[in-house]
Amino acid sequence: MKKREMEDMPLCKFHMKIFAYASGSSFVDGYSLGIIAIALSVMQSDFDMSVTMIGLLGMGTLGGMVIGGLVGGYFTDILGRKKMFIIDMLLLGIFTTLQFFVTDPTQLVVLRFLIGIALGTDYPIAGSLMSEFAPSKHRGALLGGINAFWFIGYAISYLIGYFLLPLGQGSWRWMLISGALPIVLLLLARLNMPESPHWLIKQGRHKEANTIVEKVFGQGVVVSHEEQEAKKTSLVDIFKNGYGKRTFFVSTFWSLQVMTTFAIGTYIPEILGQFGFQDGSQKYLGSAIINLFYLIGIFPALYLVEKYGRRPTLIWPFLITAIALFSLGVLSAGSTPFIFIILIFIIYGIFNTGMGSHQWIYPYELFPTHVRGTGGGFTTTISRIASAISTFFFPVILDNFGVSITMYIAAFLLMIGFVISAFMAPETKSMNLKEAGSI
């Protein structure tokens, strides 16, 4: 009787446990990036900071993530998923705790940069581990679902920050150290997780891999019938043997998607103000509604990505979001009702974050096991550079050229994403990792 492959096993509690480990990374990332925004608003009472220093504190984490994604992904393929998961979370907990004790802004900038390195490292670890344990039929939903926890972590950070504000002077210290709690809980949980059998096979450690598979799924289950040879990791492999095309595709679609996501999400109150909605309640209520639908848009995408596949759930949202932003550019010239503008932004938000789930799907399906972390880490790095650039230049363009031109530029970027995805996006629905990495 032929043994079953682990990717053919039905969804079970073990898969959801791995999902919790992986999505915890996304939650911590969102929380860390959100809480610094609240903390910065109250730090001025302790430190007399220049605009440059405030900018460095805000961008420090993103800067660290650029390095963390590149270096962390490579070491994830060298040292293993479990070992890197634990080391990374331990360092992240230490750096987060040390924020409480800083005596000047420069120390905090250094710590935020180190936190960014740790967060950037966690992306390829989480994506690799989830993809290598997930059943083929549910891999897209499980990987895409990780993205939802970024928004949850971000939202909770604002809630915690709000409740800590009454502590007054020094409340920012408690805000920043509050991020250590989920990190410690995640670290303790990860101590008992198994190593990826796919990674062990690539190291030639077949006996360990089979022992883990049998312990988790029982007798009669193997890692794979085909993937049995050991293979060493090299950074240049993601640019060779046809993988360069995949690296370009993932880096490009991911970058084009997050450039508008981060820029519009960060400056939505200012955008609504330029549409003529200067009333504070309108601006901030509108911002809250739009950001809420950023989260809501993920959930239908997790169903659709498994029912209809990866290609249509990436290609058509690119087109729909481009049309939505182009429409906003046209409408900015007239006097359009508030509710109508908000509805178009909601359409943009739902489809934008829906296709954003592919940030966690394609990078960890299209690269083979020996460079899966490297490929995921490299593309994470490129996307973070793109998001930092767009977040920096967006307000400059908005102030100098107005909301209409700004929306047209954003729509043009999304249209490029539509064209590239239409020509390059592969279909990996229901494929095992061997098949997805070979198309």
Across the structure, where does each feature detected by a protein language model lie?
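Transmembrane-helix signature of 12-pass secondary carriers
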Residues: M1-I439
